[in-house]
Amino acid sequence: MEAMKVERILITLALLLSPALAFAEDFCGDLKNAFGPFDYRKGHTEFAANLHLVEIAHFTPEVEKGIKGSSSYLGGDLDYTLRAFPNHHRALVTMAQVGLRDKTPQVSQAKYPVECYFNRAIRFTPDDGIVHGAYANYLFALGQTDRALDEFKQAVALEPENPTINYNLGLALLKVKDYDNALIYAKKAYALGFPLPGLKNKLVEAGKWDDKPQ
């Protein structure tokens, strides 16, 4: 019963957060914030001092690991971090992991559902391929493979030399039995130095791996 309830909520969120729907911003809130918002990609340059202030109080190692909150509840600290830095890559990953771990679309004490934080990040920095990749990983973990593929493809278009994104897109393509394209992205990921053999092994098992150069 609980699993069915969560699934219904996720389907509703998927409809609400479709990029084609104008009210996604109303549902997930606008990006104005008392502190920020700042671009996480500039967190070691232009916004280094701002990032330090946020992380030392709200994104401690225990928060990042999803163990417990620092200044408040875990969900509250993640929310604060992601309102100040909407595209904070590591905080987005933690928010998604906690939601998956707790089997809930909205982490306790977070202001918005997990998907909203990705929606906000994409609205803030639509050209951030790491955000699209993290969102794709979340959708893939939920079993929403088609939506995950769309996000992975956007991520690869923005970050074509990122080995992890290429690898994960290959895994998603393998899931839908698109072996030819899975092989292309697998080979690219390995050429870029991705260390794990899992995707290659799965393609070998399916009889789809070859050692021809791309």
Which stretches of residues belong to each language-model region?
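TPR alpha-solenoid repeat register
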Residues: 91, 131, 165, 198-199
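N-terminal leader/linker segments that initiate helical-solenoid repeat arrays
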Residues: 24-76, 84
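Canonical tetratricopeptide repeat
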Residues: 94-97, 134, 168, 202
